[in-house]
Amino acid sequence: MSMSCKINWLMVLVIIALSNLESSLGRLVFEGSAGLMNGFTTLTNTKKHAYGQAFNDEPFPFKNSVNGNMTSFSFTFFFAIVPEHIDKGSHGIAFVISPTRGIPGASADQYLGIFNDTNDGNSSNHIIAVELDIHKDDEFGDIDDNHVGININGMRSIVSAPAGYYDQNGQFKNLSLISGNLLRVTILYSQEEKQLNVTLSPAEEANVPKWPLLSLNKDLSPYLSKNMYIGFTASTGSVGAIHYMWMWYVFTFIIVPKLDFDIPTFPPYPKAESQVKLIVLVTFLTLALFVALAASALIVFFYKRHKKLLEVLEEWEVECGPHRFSYKELFNATNGFKQLLGEGGFGPVFKGTLSGSNAKIAVKRVSHDSSQGMRELLAEISTIGRLRHPNLVRLLGYCRYKEELYLVYDFLPNGSLDKYLYGTSDQKQLSWSQRFKIIKDVASALSYLHHGWIHVVIHRDIKPANVLIDDKMNASLGDFGLAKVYDQGYDPQTSRVAGTFGYMAPEIMRTGRPTMGTDVYAFGMFMLEVSCDRKLFEPRAESEEAILTNWAINCWENGDIVEAATERIRQDNDKGQLELVLKLGVLCSHEAEEVRPDMATVVKILNGVSELPDNLLDIVRSEKLENWYERYSKVIDPVTTEESIGNLAITEPILPSGRPRLFL
């Protein structure tokens, strides 16, 4: 039984709430730079290369006093970091579980007031910490200068992720740890699941995010004693920062109750006297020069206004495949970018009509990493622009204007598939034949990306929202505007997990490495969702029906997998087709990557060229993970490709290890 299911019946045992630390100082013991500043509890002040500690004066029971078993628990605390410089932090803050009240011999700077250079990494430390790190230390393998990590006995994080949270729609939102805003951290540990989850979110978010930022599957009982002290540490280096602690809550159960409070505003970092004088001087000089510069500014303004729409085509852009549109063309086509269709995975999407041809287009304004050069970015887009398949949304061209990038696609009038699945009651319901056709269209597109091109293309985000429907109810797979090409033999690793929860294969969370198998997993979930007419997760449904994959397998084991679909779908379908799609969906979404078929095999099964094995349920249940489709390949033709890509024909056998990989 999952942690989310158990939450519904867990009983409240104990609540220890230190609400508003500044009024509960008697329960805290301060060390180092920790104390009071501006009426708030702080772990550091303006002193450089210093650390502060604040620990509860009484230990917290982590193990049952009768049988010594580890107990489940949750912690919630609120903090804010106000840096000396708005764009540069110091070192960071950490939540700590320690065998002692306070940590003797701790060092500042990169050690966060927890460890030092001699005891870092010692198994005898028995310290568990959640770090909110604002400085990238290569010696500890830090991923960046704005991340959250789980550490055991040392400063090298076991798992870490860039600071952010998943909103109620499952979209990832970045957060800055040095924004000066109040942030909430929730730490939940289930002893039965042996799982530690960490979430980070803005304080104004009413609810804790449904999906954790970090998840560590590990039994913590060997690292914790019966009674341990809980507290916080922080440190500064050559750059100063004030680390504020505001509220914290401890629960011996894994429910996190809704908290109601007024969000405080923290004062800015105190400026040195020399800085104040400098600000006054700069202000005076600015005002003195303003009049003299005004005339020049007006001249420059009118000159730039005249040349506003002038765009220069650089020599290297001639090599790019897609057509380059002028900014003026797109500005006029979209009526000044006022016809907003929605927000895509990388930015807003606008509807437009090209003058002359009256062709309908969709224009996506791409938000991209500023560290990535425009030349490199356009090279990647030119690669995507050469994809040609009837079930892929076609990239018509691009526009580069003022360091912004606009991608131009065919406009599909019926919008995305999710509107048909979960739209209003007035929305036309899809028939079974339409659903089956959509599933086959998406399968064909994905098979082309995996097997039909000169590169292996990994989509990474298969879901109904990324499937668009044309006026004839044909489906096209979209939202693959940004990509990176990796040479043969390169083992891709990513510090940011891409995709949508529910459609992400289990191995993605462990390795962060997308593969064709992770795409197949997402497609399996997609098949179940479309064919059953149910969401992947129904929290209000009966417990056995709450998770769609589990419900489908239960129905299958009970003799009729078709019962997993809604009554409307069961009454309007070819039962044989529905049974085939459901079984194939369960197989594709198997937790073990080795069990899943490839997309070429999936297409053959959907088209009736090949059949599923008779003992498929045994394969799904089997703990011995083998490539069933390799054994089954005696009745399946070898995968070869003969696809037309513009004027290029590919007739050689396609092998995943023999081509570069393209990650979308």
Swiss-Prot record:
Catalyzed reactions? L-seryl-[protein] + ATP = O-phospho-L-seryl-[protein] + ADP + H(+); L-threonyl-[protein] + ATP = O-phospho-L-threonyl-[protein] + ADP + H(+)
Chain sites annotated for binding ATP:
L341, G342, E343, G344, G345, F346, G347, P348, V349, K364
Glycosylation is annotated at: N69, N116, N122, N174, N197
Reported EC number(s) for this entry are 2.7.11.1
Could you cite one Gene Ontology molecular function of this protein?
A: protein serine/threonine kinase activity
Location in or out of the cell: Cell membrane
Q: Where is the active site?
A: D461
Question: Which residue ranges does the entry give as Cytoplasmic-facing topology?
Answer: 300-664
Question: What is the main EC category here?
Answer: transferase
| Signal peptide bounds | 1-26
Q: Which UniProt keywords apply?
A: ATP-binding, Cell membrane, Glycoprotein, Kinase, Lectin, Membrane, Nucleotide-binding, Receptor, Serine/threonine-protein kinase, Signal, Transferase, Transmembrane, Transmembrane helix
Q: How does it sit in the membrane?
A: Single-pass type I membrane protein
**Which PROSITE patterns does its entry note?**
PROTEIN_KINASE_DOM, PROTEIN_KINASE_ST
GO cellular component annotations of the record: plasma membrane
The record lists the membrane-crossing segments as 279-299
Specify the Protein kinase domain's residue ranges: 335-617
Q: Per the record, which residues fall in region Legume-lectin like?
A: 28-250
Q: What is its main location?
A: membrane
Q: Which residues lie on this side of the membrane: Extracellular?
A: 27-278
Q: Which family does it belong to?
A: In the C-terminal section; belongs to the protein kinase superfamily. Ser/Thr protein kinase family. In the N-terminal section; belongs to the leguminous lectin family.
The name this protein goes by in its record: Probable L-type lectin-domain containing receptor kinase V.3
Q: Which organism is it from?
A: Arabidopsis thaliana
